[in-house]
Amino acid sequence: MEDIISHIRDKLKDSIIKVEEKATPRVYIEFKPENIPEAAEFVFKELGCRMITASGIDTPQGIEILYHFSQDVSGKVISLRTLITNKKSPEIDSIAHIIKGAEWIEREIWELLGVNFKGHPDLRHLLLIDDWPEGKHPLRKDNR
């Protein structure tokens, strides 16, 4: 795992907030939201990882987004983590132009948590009915 972390640190050292190894073979690397596209592109194109999925969670501090990647040759999992602190209007740059497979999961996070993925080619309902009330996001704690 150290070799992967050192490659990422060499390339992205100025934008890394925190590196956390919780359980082998997984590492969480935290970035500011504006650095996620560059980090995802590096992990995907340079390290040869595939995107597994992305996840989002409404926390007291903001909306946390994680992009999960697998480096299949080594069996390692790299999770790129970021926190969007503006819960009233959460937004982050989409990575769908870098990784086509991110399109649907970003749509799901947009729909369920209300995160606007800037530059996404097709933000429209995926799981909810088309006339779902605007501004109501089922996984947001303020909707309970």
Residue ranges of predicted features:
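Terminal low-complexity/charged segments
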Residues: 1-144
